[in-house]
């Protein structure tokens, strides 16, 4: 099996770590070798969270610059910040709904999302951008952004995982109250 390197970025509270865990669990259930790591920013909602999932015969979960096969971004600014991990062949899947950082005593200037997407498109050949927050709200699960992003990943990339293994990982790791909406 070829190695598949998935770099996942977002901000605290978006479910990045749980999403990476679900990919890893699905891989393990199928006997696919998997290595994972995560880096947390601030210990509160809004800090940067990075996860890596490497499927296949790799020796390390570290994804070097220009080596990600997939960049899965739960927040558009974080997609741009992680662009060093991408190359021309990387698939970028990004949520377009920004999480504007909290700045005590002031407000933050957030660049237009169209400008962020243009930065992504200038480096990689394939960018899939959509409002995952809106999709999760329409599905009746306001906390389901991570599941929407996983669905986009599974639909857009050639993953070595079966639908059954992915669904079982959701059942095993998801909150019982949201399992059904996460599976749909």
Model feature map: region roles:
Residues 1-184:
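Active-site cofactor/cluster-binding pocket
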């Amino acid at each position: 099996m070829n190695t598949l390197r998935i770099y996942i970025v977002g901000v605290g509270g978006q479910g990045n770590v749980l999403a990476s865990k679900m990919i890893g669990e699905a891989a393990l259930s199928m006997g696919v070798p998997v290595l994972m790591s995560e880096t947390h920013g601030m210990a509160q909602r809004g800090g940067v969270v990075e996860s890596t999932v490497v499927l296949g015969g790799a020796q390390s979960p570290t994804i070097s610059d220009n080596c990600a096969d997939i960049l899965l971004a739960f927040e558009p600014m974080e997609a741009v910040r992680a662009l060093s991990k991408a190359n021309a062949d990387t698939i970028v899947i990004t949520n377009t709904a920004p999480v504007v950082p909290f700045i005590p005593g002031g407000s933050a200037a957030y660049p237009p999302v169209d400008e962020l997407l243009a930065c992504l498109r200038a480096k990689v050949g394939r960018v899939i951008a959509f409002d995952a927050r809106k999709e999760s709200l329409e599905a009746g699960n306001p906390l389901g952004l991570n599941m929407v992003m996983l669905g986009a990943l599974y639909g857009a990339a050639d993953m070595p995982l079966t639908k059954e293994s992915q669904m079982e990982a959701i059942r095993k790791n998801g909150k019982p109250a949201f399992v059904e909406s996460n599976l749909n």
